[in-house]
Amino acid sequence: AGWRACWIGFQHMKGNKQNKEIASYRLIAPERKGRIFLDRLTFPVKKMNDRTTPDLQIPYNNSLSYRDLWHWCLVWKWEQQSYDIPLPSKLTSEQKKELKTIEQRLTDFLEVKKAPQGPINAGYKTFEKAAISPSIAGTGFIGTPIVAPDEQDKKKGEMSWNDIETMLSGFAYDAYYNQNETSKKNYFTVFDYAIDQGFAYGSGMGTNHHYGYQVRKIYTTAWLMRDAIYKHPHRDAYLSTLRFWAALQETRQPCSPTRDELLDSWHTLLMAKFISAMMFPDAREQAQALSGLSRWLSSSLRYTPGTIGGIKVDGTTFHHGGFYPGYTTGVLATVGEYIAFTNGTSFELTEDARKHMKSAFIAMRN
């Protein structure tokens, strides 16, 4: 249940498309009972963004033939992957100790001495504008639409991922540091509403390009709220949403040698992947996910060919087809944090991966 954006270009629609003079359309219902509501139904005159996102609703959407699609838009394709790293039947005492060490390092990194009042105030201000409340029927919500930035009309007060981030992070800080029960309640109201609006497992929200820049604090503050999330009846929906939008599913397999836009992934979603992996309630699944993530990151740190993104044999870092030192500083910092979190454990990166990181630092120094 909930609203799901479905964007698709004519070229990716099914059926006979020899005649491009469209005169009508049909909606064909599946052979089962249910109700569907249509809203914001448009037929764009201007060309749609090429980065329409295949998802659970329209998995055949988009040929994904452009390099700048090989990142944000592949979340559903990656969801079809399975781990080839087996789930351990039980963890050794050493593995349990390592996970606790990593958990404490992450907590120490993310905690602050006191609640930051600015983000809390911003969360409440945005929440007031969002005007979220249960629907009259009691089966959903009413409130401000939350949509992808491409269709967002800010003049009408419509919101997007950055507003979800503002509300969730603000309420998380207040609930965690000040034990504010109202903020705790608001946190889960916003999370439920975000899922209702399409920030959910299996949804691409029409187009999800560049969303990683607008969701980072959703993850860092979800870590602070993890105990409350674990106890909530909607726990599985929250965790599956976090994992899906972190693109943790990509790390069920090693990184493809031809994968482009790696700097974007490291910079915006590596921390999200890490936190999602650490938030499995079952420690065995944590170990499996963390093993997959470390393997994926190590393999992504291989020297990449040509002009695709990543680290080159001379240590230079490529993004958008060229050397991009201005973007690299934040990227290397994020990867460096992951190295620190897993240092001295069986989940640390390979020696080759760390050597390649070192070469990137040296190239930046020069």
Sequence positions of predicted segments:
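Aromatic-lined, polymer-binding surfaces characteristic
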Residues: 103, 107-366
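Extreme N-terminal leader/anchor segments
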Residues: 55-126
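Exposed low-complexity, polar/acidic, P/S/T/G-rich flexible segments that act as propeptides
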Residues: 33-62
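Extended interaction regions within the primary functional domain
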Residues: 26-30, 39, 46, 50, ...
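Extracellular beta-strand ligand-recognition surfaces/modules
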Residues: 5-43
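A surface/extracellular/periplasmic glyco- and lipid-processing/surface-interacting theme
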Residues: 28, 51, 243-247
